From Swiss-Prot:
Binding site for ATP: 104, 145, 150-155, 185-188, 193
Stored InterPro entries: ATP-grasp (IPR011761), ATP-grasp_carboxylate-amine (IPR003135), ATP_grasp_subdomain_1 (IPR013815), PreATP-grasp_dom_sf (IPR016185), PurT (IPR005862), PurT/PurK_preATP-grasp (IPR054350), PurT_C (IPR048740), Rudment_hybrid_motif (IPR011054)
Transit peptide found in the keyword field: no
Similarity comment: family membership: Belongs to the PurK/PurT family.
PANTHER family, per database record: FORMATE-DEPENDENT PHOSPHORIBOSYLGLYCINAMIDE FORMYLTRANSFERASE
Protein name: Formate-dependent phosphoribosylglycinamide formyltransferase
C-alpha cells in the first residue's frame, strides 16, 4: 500500500523530494503558506495554511491522516510533532530532531555543550542592548543570525560597533516565526565551507556523501561543487562529528551538516534535517543517488546499499533581480548548449530581488577540474534571463 506523506513547506527542495517519492509509488500532500508553491505543482493534493498556527496544522493532519510528516522549512509549530508521533505518525527524521534543528539555539547548545564539538565562540541576544553586549564578548568581526531563518535571511556580518544596530534590524526583518532572539558567532578564519550530506537509516548504517564545497553570499549559497577536495584527516573528523550529532538527534533521513574548515581543524556550523540547498549539485548526476532519492529511501525505510561518486559537478543559482509575477525564462538554449550542462527552473510564481528561481548544473568526468565546472555553471546561470509581470 502506498503511504501518504505530508510535506510541510513546498519549495524547490521539497519539489525534488516529491518527485523522488512519487517515483517510488507514494502519495503526497504538499503544504505551504501560499498556493502553487513548487512542490505543490507535482504533489497529489495541496493545502495552504500558516504552519505556525498549531490549530491549522492539527486540522490538516486530522483531515489527511498522513503516515509520514516531512518538514522542509523552519517556520512550523514543531512542538506539535511530539503529539503526532504519539498518534503513530512518523515524523522525519524525528520530532526531537525537527524541534532541535529548527532553532539554532537548541542545535548549537547540543553540539557545543552536550556533545563537546568544536564550534565558533557564540552568545545569544534578545534585544539591541543584549546584542551590543554579546558582540563585545565574542569580538569583531562576528556574524549575527536569527535563531529561526532560512536562505540566509536576516544574517549579517558585523565588522564595527557602528553596524550593530543595522544588524539587529536586519535580523528582525529576516526572522522566520515569532522568535526575536539571535545567535552571535565569532568569525572563524576558515578557508573552506563544506556540507557533508549524512544519511541515517532505519535498518542500516549511517552513510556519508562525498563532501560538497560551497560559497555563501548574503548568508545564502551561490555555488556548490562535488567533490570538494579536503584532507583525509579532516574528512574523518567531519564524518565523526556528523555521526555524533545525527545519532543524538535520532531518526531516519538525510541531513545537511555544515562545517568550516580552518587551519586549526574542523568546526561544526549548522545542521538541516532534510535535503540541503548546496546538495542540489547532486542533481547533476554526481552520485548514484541524488540527495532527494537518498532522503526518499531513508524516509520510507528502503535500503541504501552504498553511495558512489560517479562524476564531478557544480551548481550555480539563478537569482531574480526585481519584484514581479508570472516569471518566464529566456536563454535556456544558450545555457544548455555545452556538454554536461543542465538547468532546473523551480516554478516559483512570484519573484523578488535575490530570490532563488532556478539552478544551473554542470558535470564532468570524476577527475575534472571542479573550479572549471563551477565557472561554467556560473556562466550558464548568467545566460538565463528572467522576464515577469512587474508590480509597482
Amino acid at each position: 500500500m502506498p503511504k501518504t506523506i505530508m510535506l510541510l513547506g513546498s519549495g524547490e527542495l521539497g519539489k525534488e523530494f516529491v518527485i523522488a517519492v512519487k517515483r517510488l509509488g507514494q502519495r503526497v500532500v504538499a503544504v505551504d503558506s501560499y498556493d502553487d508553491a513548487p512542490a505543490q505543482q507535482v504533489a497529489d493534493r495541496r493545502e495552504v495554511i500558516d504552519m505556525l498556527d498549531g490549530r491549522a496544522l492539527d486540522a490538516i493532519v486530522a483531515k489527511h491522516r498522513p503516515d509520514i510528516i516531512v518538514p522542509e522549512i523552519e517556520a512550523i509549530r514543531t512542538e506539535r510533532f511530539y503529539d503526532y508521533e504519539k498518534q503513530g505518525i512518523q515524523v522525519v527524521p524525528s520530532a526531537r530532531a525537527a524541534n532541535f534543528t529548527m532553532n539554532r539555539k537548541a542545535i548549537r547548545d547540543l553540539a557545543a555543550r552536550d556533545l563537546g564539538l568544536r564550534t565558533a565562540n557564540y552568545r545569544y541576544a534578545s534585544s539591541l542592548e543584549e546584542l551590543r553586549s554579546a558582540v563585545g564578548e565574542v569580538g569583531l568581526p562576528c556574524v549575527v543570525k536569527p535563531l529561526m531563518s532560512s536562505s540566509g535571511k536576516g544574517q549579517s556580518t558585523v565588522r564595527s560597533e557602528a553596524e550593530i544596530e543595522a544588524a539587529w534590524s536586519y535580523s528582525q526583518s529576516g526572522k522566520r516565526g515569532d522568535i526575536a532572539e539571535v545567535i552571535v558567532e565569532a568569525f572563524v578564519p576558515f578557508h573552506t565551507e563544506i556540507t557533508l550530506l549524512t544519511v541515517t537509516q532505519k535498518n542500516g548504517p549511517t552513510l556519508f556523501c562525498p563532501p560538497i564545497g560551497h560559497r555563501q553570499e548574503r548568508g545564502d549559497y551561490q555555488e556548490s561543487w562535488q567533490p570538494c577536495r579536503i584532507s583525509p584527516e579532516q574528512l574523518e573528523e567531519a564524518q565523526n562529528i556528523a555521526g555524533k550529532v545525527t545519532e543524538a538527534l535520532t531518526g531516519a533521513g538525510i541531513w545537511g551538516v555544515e562545517f568550516f574548515l580552518a587551519d586549526d581543524g574542523v568546526y561544526f556550523s549548522e545542521l538541516s534535517p532534510r535535503p540541503h540547498d548546496t546538495g542540489m549539485v547532486t542533481l547533476a548526476g554526481t552520485q548514484n543517488l541524488s540527495e532527494f532519492e537518498l532522503h526518499a529511501r531513508a524516509v520510507l525505510g528502503l535500503p541504501v546499499p552504498d553511495i558512489t561518486l560517479l562524476r564531478a559537478g557544480a551548481s550555480a543559482v539563478i537569482l531574480a533581480d526585481r519584484v514581479g509575477n508570472n516569471p518566464s525564462f529566456d536563454g535556456l538554449d544558450a545555457a544548455l548548449a555545452e556538454p554536461g550542462s543542465d538547468i532546473r527552473i523551480f516554478g516559483k510564481p512570484v519573484m523578488r530581488p535575490y530570490r532563488r528561481m532556478g539552478v544551473a548544473l554542470m558535470s564532468g568526468e570524476k577527475g575534472s577540474d571542479v573550479d572549471e565546472l563551477k565557472r561554467q555553471a556560473i556562466a550558464n546561470a548568467e545566460k538565463v534571463m528572467i522576464k515577469c509581470d512587474e508590480t509597482v
